[in-house]
Amino acid sequence: MSAQFEPVWRALQKKVDSGWAPGLVAGIRHGGTTEYFATGVRTLGQPGKMRTDTPFRIASLGKPVAGALAASMIADGTLAPDDPADVWLPELAYPRVLTSPDAPLERTVPAERDITVRHLLTLTHGMGAIFDSTPLARAMAEAGIAPDPIPPAMTPDEFMHRLAGLPLEHQPGTRWSYHTGSDLLSVLLARAGAGPLRQILAERVTGPLGMDGTGFFADPAELPTAYRPGPDGLEVLDAPDGVFSHAPAFESLGGGLVSTVPDYMAFLTALEGDALLPAEQRRHMTSDQLNDLQREGLAEMVGPGVSWGWQVAVDTEGREPWRAPGGYGWTGGTGTTAYVNPSAGFIGVLFTQRLMAGPRENFNYFWEPLAAAL
């Protein structure tokens, strides 16, 4: 390891020593070289250590992978951004829209336009995470299709059936709403590719990039315990032999992917060059694709200075020392984060097994010392 990033590794070690999380793995790429750091254990009270190649549940860091997979299919003509989504998702045909976000479910009007592939890519199709207790929020939770760190416990067809029975919160194309569009995109990609999503992902992304540790489940002997913060300390969210230890019914790139830090670093490194996508599709994916009205939904969740490309956040301002306009990345609710800063020439990836306490929790304990080191 170089001395340059020693302060970063010390900061991460201090975080683990404090009991914040049992362990973590990080990677930094700068100046054409990559360094990794692993510390702590995979499960509290057990000796198994974190390793550089330890697999993690990466939650919403699967979304940029979905964006890249979709961009690949757009590049070869399998999809086009303005295709109606109901070509592959007939359950989305003729949607109804609530007269207001908090209206009763029966108070709807027809959608003013079709839902398109672009709407799913940019999370503007009209439905997603709802942070207020509205009739639609309650109905999504009761149906088992509300955003959650654990993927839907049903087949994609059943997910689509349940979702089709509910109205949209907003007119398609008018507002950014988190997550649900990513699950819909996952179903669409599998249907458009005429195969299981795992197979299409392997053919187009993980196979060519040698991402052997990335998939929809992992060996329970290698998988860390996932924890969430509770009133008396860390509580188990998912055990090593839990949900992510076997093939799921729903293969979701919105929140169901398992990966390693080196694999994810390989993905982002390829995304920065020409190894994964043609320049045009890469530019669309990693640049601002929202208008001012759509962006209001994103600003409510993450604040100003950030917009959205194809399944990934993009910086329109550089509001922290490690950020810059044109930078892109995202976080995962299970405690993962990744960011690419093309102007400063670095990529950072950090995987932990501790669930984020909320959308405002950050990873500044990693990014701040990294910015200082650079």
Describe the residue ranges of each PLM region.
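Short, surface-exposed loop or secondary-structure junction motifs
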Residues: 36, 95-325
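Short, gly/Ser/Thr-rich active-site loops of penicillin-recognizing serine hydrolases
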Residues: 273, 286-297, 357-374
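Active-site SXXK
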Residues: 6-13, 32, 57-85, 182-190, ...
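Short, conserved catalytic-motif segment at the N-terminal edge
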Residues: 2-58, 78-80, 97-106, 364, ...
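Acidic helix-start/capping segments at beta-turn-to-alpha-helix junctions
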Residues: 86-95
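Short loop/turn microsegments at loop-to-beta-strand junctions
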Residues: 22-24, 56, 196, 334-337
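Glycine-rich phosphate/pyrophosphate-binding beta-alpha loops
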Residues: 249-256, 327-339, 352-358
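Short, well-ordered beta-strand elements
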Residues: 35-37, 338-341, 345-354
